[in-house]
A protein has these predicted regions:
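Basic nucleic-acid-binding alpha-helical/helix-turn surface characteristic of O6-alkylguanine DNA
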Residues: 1-116, 150-168, 182-194
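Short glycine/serine-rich loop segments
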Residues: 116-185
Length: 194
């Protein structure tokens, strides 16, 4: 699969499998003065190049159009795979159920953005994510799958496989994704292999 990267003045505004986000960005910037944007560029990259780009980008390298709430949800997702304040990526507070895996449910993410009752609003913000993989919406999986992962981990703690991930991604449901569950599974595997 080829990914389309759209940059505005050198900052990544979208990464997608089609041009729909570019059309949305064009509509947003059309409301501004022509001087507001110096340069808009697009390029196509492979999934492996996307993984490398995802490692290199910082939050400040993104040019995002969305509401304050959407940006808060996207930032929480971004923080799943990018170190925050000296933390290791994918290592968070046990109270938020994330443990060392970046896979989480919509309700887990809603709790992370301090809006546990706003699961639907969080799901909507995730669906509008303009920067695939870098803002890793593909790491949101059904709650049942997250629960299964945690149960396997608890069982593993009592064995000599303590701390190992015994679950196979192929054995859990990864849920829906704009580009299909096969692409989502591929992105999850690449993310976890980092």
């Amino acid at each position: 699969m080829k990914w389309i990267v759209t940059e505005i003045d050198g900052k990544v505004a979208s990464i997608a499998g089609d041009y729909r986000h570019l059309a949305g960005i064009a509509a947003r910037i059309a409301a501004h003065s022509p001087d507001a944007v110096e340069r808009i560029a697009t390029r196509k990259i492979t999934t492996d190049e996307l993984v490398e780009l995802g490692k290199a980008l910082r939050w400040e390298d993104l040019c995002l159009y969305g509401s304050k709430f959407q940006k808060a949800v996207w930032k929480a997702l971004f923080d799943l795979t990018h170190p925050v304040d000296g933390e290791d990526a994918c290592h968070f507070d046990q109270a938020k159920r994330v443990e060392k895996s970046p896979l989480m449910s919509y309700s887990d993410l809603a709790a992370r953005v301090d809006n546990p009752q706003g699961v639907r609003a969080v799901a909507h913000a995730v669906a509008l994510n303009p920067v695939a993989y870098v803002i890793p919406c593909h790491l949101i999986v059904p709650k049942e799958s997250v629960d299964k992962i945690h149960e396997i981990r608890r069982s593993a703690e009592a064995t000599l496989f303590r701390g190992s991930d015994l679950y196979l991604l192929d054995s859990i449901s990864v849920g829906e994704y704009a580009y299909g569950p096969e692409i989502k599974l591929e992105l999850i595997k690449k993310q976890l292999a980092k």
